[in-house]
Each structure stands twice: as structure tokens, then as C-alpha cells.
Amino acid sequence: MSQTVRTRPEGSGQALSEAYDTALLDLDGVVYAGGDAIAHAVDSLATARAGGMHLAYVTNNALRTPDAVAGHLTELGIPTVASDVITSAQAVARLISEQVPVGARVLVIGGEGLRVALRERGLEPVDSAEDEPVAVVQGYGGPDLTWSRFAEACYAIARGVPWFASNTDLTIPGARGIAPGNGAAVEVVRIATGAEPQVAGKPLPPMHRETILRTGAERPLVVGDRLDTDIEGAFNGEVDSLLVLTGVTDGAQLLAAPPQHRPTYVDADLRGMLTGQPEVVEAGDGFRCGGWTATAGGQELELTGEGEALDGLRALCAAAWTAAGESACELDGGKALARLGL
């Protein structure tokens, strides 16, 4: 793919909820953390919807069904129906269905979300390698997924059965912090078998295809908290993205982002959907946003001025990404970020 290398966050003269017809929202770390809504999420989403924006919830978490996800969101005060939810389970089920016959048995290492998605594609979920599956699919199964389930996957894969994974997120955010995600479980099976799975979830094309097919979005905006899934998925799909800082990405990771991990816009939380985005402009040897000016020095990023912390971060992104070009920035931004409280 040939794309222009992004060297700064973009500005927007109108609210993002007006500039785009559909928000493709990640869930964990964006809308909620654990069982609780993230601050400002409920009101921001209600305002965006009232203004005519279609909201779709796109998650790499394959554990729960779209019905269950919609129910949870509705309980949090975000009215949602199952058709508003797109999961990596649905994407991987479509991928499998394109390679095996209707009615084929598929060994499931994961939760109910995978089973429901497979049945929707006319496939039969099974639990044992002895059930003669023609494929193995692995997705997040929650904290109670046992070692014996990984063993069943290994037994089937050793017989030459193709292996699929809903996603490879190494971590998942929760109310108590960061926990192992499906990617960590996939690594267990990979190491044990030496096999490589076909992966459907963000940032790969099968998930983007599933999302566009189900939403019909024409001017989508990906909204996420992860650089290596949400933002890279938007890059691969050639659509714009908004990074919110309510999940796993911190300022240092953002400054060091290679081109495929650089978002179109950066904001603190989902309130960023409701506003225009400030311009980052060249200023001498550096870049200015709001009251801050950032420059790339010999070994570090330097920041002068005062104002909103997010404006300082946007200016630092421009200095870092411009200095790095097509690579990841190696300049130290620690002092500048500390000055912003980030």
C-alpha cells in the first residue's frame, strides 16, 4: 500500500461527528473499561447520535455475542441493538466459511461469541479434537479459559487442521488494569505447535471488510485507543482515525509511532468527536498548536509555551513524526511530556 506519510495530526474546522457519517468505535478502553462506562462516553455518544452520526461498535473481543454487547451498552445508558455491534468473531467466522464446506465442524477455543458467529455461517462448533473438526478457531475466552482448551487446539493443529484466530491483541484493559488478551493465548498455541494462524481481527483486512459490509459506512471515522489495532486498522483500510487517551496508549508511545500507527486526530476522550480539531502549523524550526511550540533537538523533543496539554501533545507529535519520517521517532520526549502532565 502506498500512502502519504503522516507527519502531524490534522485539524478540522467542523465537529468530527458532522464531518463523518459513521463512527466505528472500539469498546474496551474507549467506551468502557471493565463493566463501567468511561467518563464522558455516554453523553458524547448521545450527542453524536442526536446530530445524525451512525454509531457502530467494533471490537476485537470475541467473547460476547453482539446481543450481549448491545445489552451491556444499553445498561450503561447507550441505547444499542445487536446490528450496531461488529465483533472479530463475526469476521473470523466469515473467513472460515469461505474456506470450508457448509455444516463443517470447527473446534472452538473461546467463548459464546465465537459459537454464535459460526452457527450464523452454517458451521458446527465442537469442543474436542476427537470430533474431527476441519478447522480450529481461537478467540478470547475470558479469565476462566483452561489449559486443557489450548491442548485441544494443539492436538488438532498437529494433525494438519487449519488454525484461525479472531485477533492477536496481547492485552485487554479492565477495571483493575491491563490483563492478558487473546494474543497472549495465541502465542501459547503458536509456540507449542510452530503453526501460524490466519487472523481476522483489527488491524487486518477481514475485520475492516466485515465492518464496512455490516454498516454501509461511506465516510467512516475509526475511534480507538490502541495504535497497533485500531489506528493501524484504519491505516490499512485507508480511513481516518481518532485516538483517545482513555485506554492503553500513552504519550510516549504516540510520539514514537511509525507511520501506520499515527492517527488522523488525537483527543483526550470521546468528547473529541463533538468538536473541531485544532490545526498544527509550522513555526520556524518547529510546530505550534495552541500556545505550545515543539521542536526536535539533537537527542530530545523540546517544548516551549503554555496552554492546553493536548495542544502541546499535538505539537510534539508533529515534531516527532516529522523528524522520524517513515521510521519510529527515537528522540526522548520524556521532559516535554512531563511538563504537560502526560
Named regions from a protein language model:
Residues 2-25, 33-35, 42, 47-50, ...:
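Asp-based, Mg2+/Mn2+-dependent phosphohydrolase catalytic module
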Residues 29:
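Receiver (REC) domain active-site loop signature in two-component systems and cognate sites
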Residues 58:
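Glycine-rich loop-to-alpha-helix module at the N-terminal edge of alpha/beta enzyme cores
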Residues 88-90:
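Polytopic endomembrane small-metabolite transporters, centered on the Drug/Metabolite Transporter
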